[in-house]
Regions:
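Short, polar/charged alpha-helical segment
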Residues: 29-51, 385, 403
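Glycine-centered hinge/linker elements that transmit conformational signals in sensory
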Residues: 168-170, 213-243
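Extracytoplasmic "Venus flytrap"/periplasmic binding protein-like
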Residues: 38, 42-118, 149-160, 258-259, ...
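Long, aromatic- and glycine/proline-rich binding clefts that accommodate carbohydrate-like moieties
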Residues: 116-117, 280-283, 332-387, 391, ...
Length: 419
């Protein structure tokens, strides 16, 4: 009897005390957090020797601040969500674990074909030189939302080019009471750096670009920047577009604006705001010189202060997150993109796409997706460009003054990056 008891105790100790713990900080709340918790639960059930503890920190700002504070105090999780510019900043402290040795491990690694199955833009966003520091997680692309009922009633086709967008915006804008202020706007945009960057990329320009020495240089003082700023000024001066800093899904649902560009992550809000009022749809962003668009979203990084067994366990979970079935499950249940091409062949994705014809439309742009620069000062540079954009369209400064100041400020931050 004593021998049996000791055997049971040994089994229990292995079950409850022998599992390797992986602490995972994230910023996924609401239904997205519930989906993530289900993925974590499934992983833990299928990996009895590993326990992943998912810890919701709060929004992205809260997560970023906690990571920076944790880096200073030496109190970091095993893995965390992180934007590429966060990773770039943390790399300066040499606390982010390179993943190549885990990827190439004969027992727990992945093949070259499996890694190349991850969409190229997402792979590139996780790689510095030849070193992989992250795996992609919650990714979204920009798409054009439109009021299908209104466009159909007006006999307007969905714009496929910038010129068609201008034509449609003008044709759809209505001043019903003739007071000089439109009651319905054909197009709307947010006065954010994201809006400016989307159109700058479509025009073929960049905020920064790589120089001959492999370092980023300012590219904001360009003809493309001037054309994009002029484009938005024309929209506002012609009163065929509505602009505000906040999200546009509510006024879209009210029928006040009929087209706008935002990420696919906003779909649920559009569905809620427009339900029972009109039919909506989405389409790839219009072509200007290109259809290149930035993608949004975070990756998962591992910290080097973890124990070796924790790192290997963490890699198992990271590998699980980007497996075709799991990334497809994540995408179908959250509205984000699957990160691997083979995920589109999974049963869960095929069934979802069959019942939801909108699901695969954003993927028409996946090969045109462009990543943000991997700069630790990218947030600061974005703030500079946001100021330039807002000051100009609000008439605070003329175009040349706005651009020259932005160029000067961006160059200062790039000096800081490479000092």
């Amino acid at each position: 009897m004593k021998k049996v008891f000791l055997t049971v105790l040994l089994v229990l100790s292995v079950t409850f005390f022998g599992a390797t713990k992986v602490v995972f900080w994230h910023a996924m709340g609401g239904s997205q957090g519930e989906t993530l918790n289900q993925i974590v639960k499934s992983f833990n059930e299928s990996h009895p020797d590993i326990v992943v503890e998912a810890v919701y920190i709060g929004n992205y700002n809260a997560l970023q601040q906690k990571l920076l504070a944790g880096a200073q105090a030496g109190q970091l999780p095993t893995i965390s969500q992180a934007y590429a510019n966060w990773t770039a900043k943390l790399l300066q402290s040499k606390i982010v674990e390179p993943l190549n040795k885990y990827m190439n491990d004969p027992k727990i690694g992945i093949t070259k074909a499996e890694w190349e199955d991850v969409f190229k833009a997402f792979r590139n966003n996780c790689t510095w030189g030849n070193t992989v520091y992250a795996v992609p997680f919650n990714k979204s692309l920009y798409i054009m939302y439109y009021n299908a009922t209104a466009l159909s009633a007006a006999g307007i086709s969905v714009p496929k080019s910038i010129n068609e967008l201008l034509y449609a915006a003008k044709a759809l804008t209505k001043d019903k009471n003739k007071d000089g202020k439109p009651d319905v706007y054909g197009f709307a945009f947010r006065t954010t750096v994201d809006t400016f960057q989307i159109f700058l990329m479509m025009r073929g320009g960049d905020i920064v670009k790589l120089g001959k020495d492999g370092k980023y240089i300012s590219a904001i003082d360009s003809k493309e920047t001037r054309e994009v700023l002029s484009f938005f000024k024309k929209l506002l001066d012609s009163k065929i577009a509505f602009a505000q800093g906040g999200y546009l899904n509510d006024i879209f649902g009210q029928g006040t604006v009929l087209m706008y560009i935002d990420t696919i992550a906003g779909r649920t809000y559009v569905e809620q705001s427009s339900k029972g009022k009109f039919e909506w749809s989405w389409a790839p962003v219009p072509v200007w010189m290109t259809r290149n668009v930035p993608f949004a979203g975070t990756d998962i990084i591992m910290f080097s202060n973890a124990k070796d067994e924790e790192k290997r366990a963490a890699w198992e979970f990271m590998k699980y997150l980007i497996s075709p079935e799991v990334t497809a499950y994540w995408a179908v249940n959250t509205g984000y993109l699957p990160v691997r091409r083979s995920a589109l062949q999974t049963t869960i994705w095929k069934q979802a796409a069959k019942s939801d014809p909108l699901l695969e439309i954003p993927l028409q742009q996946i090969d045109n997706a462009e990543m943000d620069p991997q700069l630790s000062v990218w947030t600061e540079i974005r703030n500079v460009v946001s100021t330039m954009f807002n000051d100009f369209i609000n008439g605070k400064v003329d175009m040349e003054t706005a651009i020259k100041k932005a160029d000067t400020d961006i160059k200062k931050y790039l000096v800081e990056e490479y000092k």
